[in-house]
Amino acid sequence: MNNTNEALDAEKKFKTSVEEAQDYIENFDILETINNVGNDEVFTPVKVCQQILDTLPMEVWSNPNYKWLNPCDKNGVFLREIALRLDEGLKKWEPDEELRRKHILQKMLFSIGLTRFTSQVSRRTVYYCSQANKKFDGKVDSEGHSINGYAIGNGAWFDTPEGNILTPKTEHSFVKGKCIFCGTNEKGKDGKPGRYSDPGQLEHYAYEFIHDSDIKTQIQKRFFGGKNMKFDIIIGNPPYQLTDGGGGSSAKPIYNLFVEQAIRMNPKFMAMIIPSRWFSGGKGLDEFRARMISDKHIRVLHDYLLAQECFPAVSIEGGVCYFLWDRDNEGKCKIFTHQQDGIIKTSERYLNENRTVDILIRDEKSLHILKKIQQKGFNSFGDIVSPRNPFGVGKLNDELFVKNKVPEGISIFGRFDKGRETKFLKKGFSVTKGNDLVNVWKVFISKADGAAGQIGNPIPARIIGKAEVGSIGTICSETFLAVGPLKNREEAENVVKYMATKFFRFLVGIRKNKNMTQDTYKYAPLISFDKCWADDDLYRLFGLDTNDIEYIEKHIKELD
């Protein structure tokens, strides 16, 4: 009896394995195996593409007259998924399968590849061949399969190799060393041509959609021979940044340029997935943020605090979001906040609901708490936070330090080989700025602490590290900010304790981005430091109720 059961169990396991293998083969998608071209260009997983398409109204799938554009095509996944939905939605309009599919690919779906390579990949995905007009040449293998391949419709649906998926043909326009469209540098630090201008490089990443001052005319020439045609729906996943190869070491965001260019084309609908960093920060994104949060045409916004939920193999600081822009309908935006714990919080509000707030606050509860605190009318703690590199300290080397403090000499607090420590500087060390903070009490706080997390990622999050008292005659290295001037040591110690409260760190977390600036501390109130404040004192002072307190306590971690 036992042998029989074992045999049946073995047979069942075998059948299950076979079924799983068969299911994998049937549902296998080659696009899921393609890695990203680089950090700037992140391929869109099929599932994410489908979720973005789900934000569009149902009527778009049964309208044969709409023209769709992906201005930043990387692998054809958007056009393919759109084509599949249109093929189903247009069955009543055109029952003949071949005529229906020909109409969809010929008359409705268009894209511009980001590079030569991605254009070919996209055509291979959508047309089954990198040449849209390639016909079957009659050569087959022993099993009857075409050796050299051929395009959909046997290459007869298009007259050109590109079809409606165009290869970019633009270059950067450099004026005084910078591209006038995307801002990238013409030359590297060594004075030689950079990666975006080097004639020896095959790709210069001059993305066509954002490298033309009259994009409407350019698009009409490229796709419609100059005819006055327009696109009804624009959708895509633009490249996120261009690495700064010149004097700076950071990367310049460019996804905002794609969004703004798409809006200029005035489509009926527009949907894109981009980093969420624009909510509260990002290099050169202040004007973009102001326009976005005041735009009442953004009707749906999905915000992922953890980017890996959309892009498993990619780390994107601050998360990612996708949104729907609706030209003909203004109103409140439906916001879906996808937290790390799998919880999705929903709200419906104008993105600039609180006119005193100049950023997009991710969740409604944080906005509610901030409103209560702002009603008390306190000044901003950011008013006593220094700019970056408060004392103008450059590169430090051992020759600048001495073992013992010299008369009238100064000390420097920073992160050295042994971690945080204070060292004595040689007499005559020049402080180039922030002299008003040298001979007073102050507090030092790190300007960068990505590991401390953000509100909602993780839960709970630390937000900032431990602040340190800065004594009279002590400055700090460029990796710290200074808070002051303060009257005495007691006041400085009270500031350190205030900055350690969950109340303070929650308000900092609302604005926190990768790098901390004085602006990061804008929402924390500037209170009296004649006394030592604890969280309970602050909750009472600002009239926070039980729900407010529970929310803060849940999301902010105790400091060690």
Roles of regions detected by a PLM:
Residues 1-301, 306-310, 319, 323-332:
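SAM-dependent methyltransferase catalytic region
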Residues 191, 534, 555-558:
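Charged, elongated alpha-helical/coil segments that serve as electrostatic interaction surfaces
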Residues 52, 122, 495, 552-553:
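A structural signal for short hydrophobic/aromatic patches embedded in well-ordered alpha helices
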Residues 128-129, 502, 558-559:
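A short structural micro-motif
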Residues 35, 39, 47, 229, ...:
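C-terminal substrate-recognition regions of SAM-dependent nucleic acid methyltransferases
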Residues 547, 552-560:
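Short, amphipathic C-terminal "tail helix"
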